[in-house]
Amino acid sequence: KVAVICHGHTVNRYSDLKYADIFYRAGFSTVIFDERYFGESTGDFCTLGQNEARDVAAIIAYVRQIFGQDCVIGLHGESMGAATALLTLKYETPDFVIADCPFADSKLLFAQWLKRNLHIPIGMIWPILRRRAKRKYDYDVESVCPIAAVQGKNVPICLMHGKSDNLIPYTHSEMLHKACVNPNSELHLFENADHARSIVMARTEYERLVLAFLHNCGLYGTENKQ
């Protein structure tokens, strides 16, 4: 059993250790890594999960080479890493995904940020932002849409989000949960937790929910020890 853990924007693989510990004690091997442009990884820019999802798909393929094609592989991500984990569903079918404070749609996220902080409607900015990203970084920021990757995918997804998140509103996780089709998918909201702080605010409860989710998926506390 292997858990691949994806960190958030501006941090590196060391921020994943607090999550890796949960999986390690649950019998999982863990993979932590620096996403492109962060830490010791190369890269000139970040694509908020679009190209990073292909990197995670390559990591999954590598894990299967080492542990076998039938090994259990799950993803955990925080913030941008959570969006990356969900976007990976376009390329791979992991056994589960745990997404902590993801955004559902990049355009919606930018619209909310602009309205909240600059009081500018997104219609004035979005075409310029898309053209600039396409010209300078060769990617379409509007295509970074985790909810589109989730739709129709029969993968159990556990969504975790702080209700006091001031960067990505918890309503993004509510939207994503509604798009989930696997009956083992879950949504858990943490009172008074700001962005990516749920595990800090309520470590014991966070770990309990992760292990309960894995148990419901048949991957913890069962005879499945792959």
What do the PLM-derived regions correspond to, one by one?
Residues V4, H9-I22, E35:
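The serine-hydrolase catalytic nucleophile loop
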Residues A20-T42:
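Conserved alpha/beta-hydrolase
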Residues G152-N154, L159-H161, D165:
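Short beta-strand/loop motif that positions the catalytic acidic residue
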Residues A193-E207:
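Catalytic histidine-centered segment of alpha/beta-hydrolase-like enzymes
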